[in-house]
Amino acid sequence: NSRISVRAHGLFGSVAGDDANGNNPDRNLNFESKIYEGGVQLEINFFEYYIGSRLHPVTPYIFGGAAVFFFKPYGNVGGERVELQPLLTEGQSKSYNSYAFSMPFGIGVKYSISKLIGVGAEWGMRKTTTDYLDDVSQTYYLNDPASEGAKGLASDPTLTHVAGMQRGNSRNNDWYSFAGVSLTVKIRMLKKEGCLDHQREGY
């Protein structure tokens, strides 16, 4: 209806980070993860909005839902782009799952610019069930990373840490966010005689 709706969504994006540009240059890790997300969301408009409304042509809204996403982190190791998950950079007994769940939620605004066209913008956060979007979660595990080649460089680019030293923070899972704009076109399937909603007085 004009206040509450359910929508399906699909998104693609990437997140990246580099310690050289952050608060932990001594760690010197870097990554980029491609993210493919799909899910469902409940959307609640503040006002009774629909495309073509003259009474409420603009409305803010909030949304929340559930999603599943696929991610694959890469890093620059010795000048080469390397997939990090297979390297087990924290000495895991097996690779972490590349699929995880997230809880999307956020805010947006919609505007009806004509009887048939609407535009919108929104921003949302994703709370996830993984701590490996950046391939960093727990501790270093190599006492001599220089002897492990690319695997050692991916785990400890500075080659200065020893097993057990803190590498990440496993107490908190990772988050990411999306921002975007939308264009919506209203399609009339049947032509009806009489007064349509957007032609009513006050709309």
Where are these regions (language model features)?
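Flexible, surface-exposed loop regions and adjacent strand-edge segments
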Residues: 22-31, 78-84, 135-145, 200
